[in-house]
Swiss-Prot record:
Record-given protein name: Transcription elongation factor GreA
PROSITE patterns: GREAB_1
SUPFAM superfamilies: FKBP-like (SSF54534), GreA transcript cleavage protein, N-terminal domain (SSF46557)
Keywords, ordered alphabetically: Coiled coil, DNA-binding, Transcription, Transcription regulation
Family per similarity comment: Belongs to the GreA/GreB family.
Function (record text): Necessary for efficient RNA polymerase transcription elongation past template-encoded arresting sites. The arresting sites in DNA have the property of trapping a certain fraction of elongating RNA polymerases that pass through, resulting in locked ternary complexes. Cleavage of the nascent transcript by cleavage factors such as GreA or GreB allows the resumption of elongation from the new 3'terminus. GreA releases sequences of 2 to 3 nucleotides.
HAMAP family (alphabetical): GreA_GreB
Protein source organism: Xylella fastidiosa (strain M12)
GO biological process, one term: DNA-templated transcription elongation
Pfam families: GreA_GreB, GreA_GreB_N
GO MF annotation terms: DNA binding; RNA polymerase binding
Signal peptide coordinates: none
Matching PANTHER family: TRANSCRIPTION ELONGATION FACTOR GREA
Coiled-coil region list: 45-72
Amino acid sequence: MRPPMTLKGVRRLRDELEHLKLVKRPEIINAIAEARAHGDLKENAEYHAAREQQSFIEGRIKQLEGELSHAEVIDVAKLNAGTKIVFGATVTLADLGTDEESRYQIVGDLEADIKQGLVAISSPVARALIGKQEGDTIVIEAPAGRREYEVVAVEYIS
């Protein structure tokens, strides 16, 4: 099965790939050429650091190309799931213990970033939410203990 990814997530990875290819790669090539011009490569720390950075960048480029070529891109705006929670849904939850609300979007594993409210489809939170609807209650076993949440809203925002 191909890993799912939102259209927004694909754009972000493509932007990173383009930046690496068009900006970072040429910078490293220039840094290597400049370090080479300094002479003896055996004891040239600048040269070795630039080569190491080149290796890292080329590895990241290959990784991004592979991820993008295998991803199943899902346009969240075109989903018609109503109030049912599926991949791509943006869900507002109310903690039944504290009445605090939080908002998460269920995204692919490669684009997850909890600080931005993006939870991976494979995470315990997302697994508990999939298939639920507005008004449903879910229980999540968190490191801090068992938490109960009510699904307040389900939206499909691109």
